[in-house]
Every structure is written in structure tokens, then in C-alpha cells.
Amino acid sequence: MINTPVPGLAPSPAPQKATLHPQAVQVRADQPADPHAMLGAFEQLLGGYALDAESVEAAEPIALVVGTSGSTGTPKRTALTAGALAASATATENFFEANADAASQWLLALPAHYIAGAQVLARSVLAGTAPVIARSVIEPVHFSPEVFLQAVEQMSLARRFISLVPTQLHKLLESADTDPHLGAEIHEALGSFTGILLGGAPASADLLAAAQELGLNVVTTYGSAETAGGCVYSGSVLPGVRVELVPEEGMPAVPDTEGKPAHDESVQVGRIWISGAHLASGYIGDTARTAEHFFTSADGTRWYRTDDYGLLSPVAAPDSNENCSEPRLQVLGRSDDVLISGGVKISARAVATVLEEHPAVREACVVGLPDARWGTAIAAAVTLVPSAISDSASTVLNEELCALLRARCTEKLGAPAAPKQLSILPDFPLTSTGKPDRAEIYSILDRDYRQG
């Protein structure tokens, strides 16, 4: 039986095709969408909304269907109403303290067929401003510093925002470090944004520290298509959103900053459940999946059961020993990121975090490989920072670095967490959104592990 945050929750029914709005936008991860066409559709679909979450109607038709290709699992089609999109946009605007005298302008640098890109268009419609669309979104060119700077030059309002994935921000900052002239332009352009939303994948501590050192207002986001985009910003739950953590059997031990299990009674650990007007209606034509993830309480409140484990901890008030009323959410990783090696539960996210703490490591990706002895062998791929790449051709130095990384994992997380396979890659293969391609990385690690 599934534990729930509210007793007596009932599974929600799956939305059917008949509930689609005549002008509903349907997108798929493997089929790039035309942002201009989507913008026109959103203008019609969201025309009756202001930046006001109170206008949500539960029975309204579906406005946006976000589909996956199924390359990493069974395809799903997440259905969102116009009201859910409006509720999410309102929460974002309120987070940045909406100013009636200063309109917001967005730069679209992510594909429109992903929820983060679609939300940039929805927020623009609700703000009443035209978004700037980067060339990399509509032309067969990659996101680059030059593409970014060209797009920023087209922005006309002072209150400006952008959504990026960590790989994109890393590319911009790395280019700035290697080219002083270009670097000044990049820093100035990034610094002109009121807010830089960073999501889609975990951002490393080094990347966030570099952004903070430059004075950039980077906000890490947590959310998905099921929540109409980000609903937790830099650990803070957005207005109108409710988050509960429900303990479950089989969760990995949660390390604190010293690498030891956390026992603080004020800290909650469990599967993340989310409620709010921004939730999706469910999965079109998929009753089983909808019933597994969406629930409705007796009072009509709907909940989304995520695939993620999290930690809610109180935040100390400035200059005080007392905690603030609003706790901070830390995402520990997906439930399917819990690997069992030799009978020990290990968090893939925790291993990646420890690897990325080493100054030579730029980013890490951790997976589990089938193994006759261990059941699952912990495997990790890492890329290196520029200063370490010059020595990467040395087999001896690579072996020494891998030994150090394994030792760090053993020290902080225990011997079972030390990767059995550790591969140093020049760069991670990327998906169309600029995220590390986990399926391709898995194939590389599996090949390396089998070759011994």
C-alpha cells in the first residue's frame, strides 16, 4: 500500500482525449516544436487569464500535452490545463516580487517542446511581453556564447529572465574564463538578468559558487511537466504550492555534511508529494500511471506523488539561533536512483555529489550496472575542469585521480559506494536540451566495465 500525506486519498482518473481544448498544444521530446506557433496558441489558450492563480478551474479542458519519446522508459503524455500553466507562472512572478510598473521579458534558450521552454512562452503571454527566442531553439545550431549574446542584445526591457540547464551556464562561464574579451561580454549579459532559472539537472556546487562570485541571481529549480515546471526555487516552496515528505521503506541512508546519517528530529526525509493549482491533470490514456502518481483527498485537494526522495530541514533565521517558519527542500535523488550493491542501498545522487566535490571534477554521472557478484555495480563517469584536462592524457595521472575519487567515496559514504567502474570522459554526450544523455553514458560505462 502506498503511504500518503493525507489519509483516505483516492487515485485520480486519467484524462481522456475528449478533454483536449480544440487549440491544445501537443509536443514530444523527440519532435522539436515551433515556438512561434506555440506562442500564438498560448495567446488564445491563456487569453482569459491574468497573472492570477485564483482563476483556475478544475474541469477546464487540456491546453498543453507534454510527451516523452519513451527512449528511457514507457512514453507518457502529461496533460496540463491553462489554469495550471497560469498558476505556475503566477508563482514564479510572485517569487521575484512582481512589479506592476515593470513588465518582465523572457529569453527562450531551451527547446519549446520541454516544459521549461513551454513555460517561458506561457509566462511571456501572461506578462504581456514578447519573448526573445535564441537562434539555437529554431535553427540547426548549438547553444553557444555567441548565440546567447545575440539574443540578449535583442532584449528591450530591464526586468529580464532566462531558463537554462546547468550545462548551458557552465558553457558560458567556461568560455568567459578562456576568452577575456568574450568573458567581459558574457559576464555583463548574465549580470543583466533579474533572475536566471537553473533546472533540468542538478547543478554542481562549483557552478553555483562561480555564479555567486559573479553576483548572478541564479535560482535552482525543482519541478517537472507534472507540476507545470519548477515549483521549488532554491529550496523554497513557491507560493500556492504545498510539499509533504512521506517516509517509505527502502530509502537509502541520508548523509549529512560530514557523510554520517542525519538523525535530527527537525529534519523530515521521505518521498516528495506536491499539491497545488499548478498540477497536471494526469497522463492521457494511461489510467495505471495516473492512479500511481495522482491522488485526490475527500476535500477535493489533488496530490502528485513524485519519483523523488527529499529532505526538509528548518532554516536558521539571520543573526538568530531560531529557525524560520519555512523549511528548505533538498532533493536527494530519484527513487530509481537508489542502487543496491552487495545488499547495501546507495544513493546515486550522493555518490555524484561526492565526486563533484573534488576540485578536478567538473561533473559526474552515476549509474548501476548488472553484475554477477554485486547484483549492481556502481559506475561513474566524470568530466574534468579545464585546468585538469591538460594532464588527462597521462594514464598514470588518470589512475591516481580515480584512486583518489574512490577513496573519497569510501570515506564519505562507505566502501560499497566507491565506483567499481570510473571513466574519465572529455565531455558528456548531451540530449537536445543540453542535459547529459544518461542512456549514452550508461552504454559507455557498460562497455568500459565489460572490457575491464
Where are the model-predicted features located?
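AMP-binding/adenylate-forming
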Residues: 82-88, 105-171, 219
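Hydrophobic alpha-helical segments in the ANL/AMP-binding
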Residues: 5-20, 92, 115-129
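Conserved C-terminal "lid"/linker of ANL adenylate-forming enzymes
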Residues: 339, 366-367, 379-381, 406-452
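Conserved pre-ATP/AMP-binding loop-to-beta segment of ANL
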Residues: 11, 47-67, 99-104
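Conserved AMP-binding A3 loop
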Residues: 63-90, 97
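Gly/Ser/Thr-rich phosphate-binding loop
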Residues: 174-235
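Conserved ATP/PPi-binding loop(s) of AMP-dependent carboxylate-activating enzymes
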Residues: 251-295, 346
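AMP-binding/adenylate-forming catalytic core of the ANL superfamily
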Residues: 300-302, 309-417
